[in-house]
Regions:
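Short helix- or helix-capping micro-motifs
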Residues: 17-20, 110-115, 163, 167, ...
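Membrane-interface transmembrane helices that cradle and orient dolichyl/undecaprenyl
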Residues: 98-101, 140-156, 261-270
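Specific aromatic-rich, kink-prone transmembrane helix
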Residues: 92, 132-150, 155-163, 307
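Transmembrane-helix motifs of polytopic, lipid-linked glycan transferases
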Residues: 80-101, 139, 143
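Signature aromatic-anchored transmembrane alpha helix within multi-pass, membrane-resident enzymes
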Residues: 315-358
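Transmembrane-lumen/periplasm boundary regions of multi-pass, lipid-linked membrane glycan transferases
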Residues: 31, 174-271, 287-290, 341-345
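Transmembrane-helix signature of polytopic, membrane-embedded enzymes
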Residues: 2, 13-14, 93-116, 134-135, ...
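Short acidic/glycine- and proline-prone juxtamembrane loop motifs at membrane-interface regions
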Residues: 119, 125-133
Length: 410
């Protein structure tokens, strides 16, 4: 049982996590558009379980299969695990702020930053690998933070397990692993290279990820071919400057002071430099590819929200600085409400189309679009329309085929 003091300090992270879950639940119950295109694919993958697929590891298919078996295949049902993952990310963000010594305001600011970020709202509202990838990155960052704060090398076991599960969710986790390795080599944490716990943790990660690795080897590394083809023919070209601009937009512009403060504090504080590497190294890799979507780096921000929120809260505690807390929290909360339709389908299609037109006219384009194409709605919303009509058309054509052709139709 948690002690009463422990229960009190968990109230805010739990409250914000609950709010996040309710936002997703309500939007899918009352304001949803339709199934997102990739959701059909993941459901089909769930019907054909394997140790890997061309474009993702196996865990999302398992999640789809279990969810469909237990809850059915309604939009609300299949998106429930994603909503839980999004809520878990918010909870861990507040928990990290608490671990850093942050009081109520610091925890609230860290959580609010995660709640209002459109990239997390979008991810938590669709069945895909994205919200689970974001959750595993955040959980791994939490364990790294605990390692840094306690100097207990046994946390490498939890880090290794989380990396392994993350690699079975989305190969994006490999970039976080690169950040951990760089942080070990470039900071005083290289002393852990002599710890058996580090190597046991690394072995745990490899063992968990091994089924998918073997599948890739046996099938000739199809995911690498998929990534190459996507970079050259599917994903839009993104310059380093545009990539950073997309980060600011997808995380909500007013969270910039929070996570940027967190990044500065990480590298100015020797103890936290390993945490800074969890962000900086993946960022440099994604910028170098010039084809990475904003959501690729999004999982690296919760720990920066936590560090930055604690630093801002401490600045607000100084004499004549009480205004800092209001200046940081109130505008973020208000604009978070105003920008919520960007992340959740709470407007009618016509109103969302009008909002998209206004944003495009102001020079704010959908950063998730492929090959720079623009549309009347953001791509993650536009691809939730037209499926009933397509189904009806396919059924009509199929019914018109001779019986012999129907038997051969796929």
């Amino acid at each position: 049982m948690l002690k009463r003091t422990q229960q009190r300090v968990l109230i805010l992270p739990l409250a914000f996590a609950g709010l996040t879950f309710l936002l997703h639940l309500i939007s899918n119950l009352f304001f949803r558009y339709g199934y997102f295109r990739d959701e059909f694919y993941y459901l089909v993958c769930g019907d054909h379980l394997a140790f890997g697929y061309v474009d993702q590891p196996p865990l999302i298919a398992v999640i789809a299969r279990v969810t469909r078996t237990l809850l059915g295949d309604s939009i609300v049902a299949i998106r429930l695990p994603s909503a839980l993952a999004g809520a878990g990310l918010v909870f861990l963000t507040g928990l990290m702020a608490r671990e850093l010594g942050g009081r109520r305001f610091a925890q609230a600011l860290a959580c609010l930053s995660a709640v209002v970020a459109p990239v997390y709202l979008i991810g938590g509202n669709i069945l895909s690998t994205i919200p689970f990838d974001q959750f595993w990155w955040t959980l791994c960052a939490f364990f790294v933070l605990r390692l840094v704060l306690t100097d207990d090398p046994r946390y490498w076991l939890a880090i290794g397990a989380t990396v392994g599960i993350g690699l079975e969710t989305k190969h994006n986790m490999a970039f976080l692993a690169c950040g951990i390795v760089a942080g070990l080599l470039l900071t005083s944490n290289r002393r852990y290279l002599r710890s058996r716990w580090l190597w046991i943790g690394a072995a745990i990660a490899v063992v968990i990820a091994l089924p998918n690795i073997l599948w890739e080897i046996v099938n000739g590394w199809p995911t690498l071919e998929f990534v190459r083809n996507a970079s050259g023919g599917k994903n839009a070209h993104v310059s380093p400057v545009a990539f950073l601009a997309n980060q600011i937009l997808s995380l909500h512009p007013l969270t910039l002071p929070v996570w940027l403060t967190g990044l500065v504090v990480c590298f100015r504080t020797p103890r936290y430099r390993l945490l800074g590497c969890l962000y900086l190294v993946p960022m440099l890799i994604f910028m170098a590819t010039q084809s990475a979507r904003p959501d690729y780096l999004a999982p690296a921000y919760p720990v920066l929200f936590a560090v930055g929120a604690v630093a801002i809260a401490r600045a607000a505690e100084r004499p004549h600085r009480m205004w800092v807390s209001s200046a940081a929290f109130v505008p973020l909360a208000l604009t978070g409400l105003l920008l919520m339709p960007i992340g959740l389908p709470i407007l009618s299609p016509a109103k969302m189309e009008a909002l998209t037109a206004r944003l495009t006219g102001a020079g704010v384009n959908d950063p998730s679009r492929e090959q720079g194409k623009t549309a009347q709605l953001p791509q993650y919303f536009a691809d939730q329309f037209g499926w009933p009509e397509l189904t009806a058309e396919v059924a009509r054509v199929y019914a018109a085929l001779p019986p012999a052709d129907q038997a051969k139709a796929v």
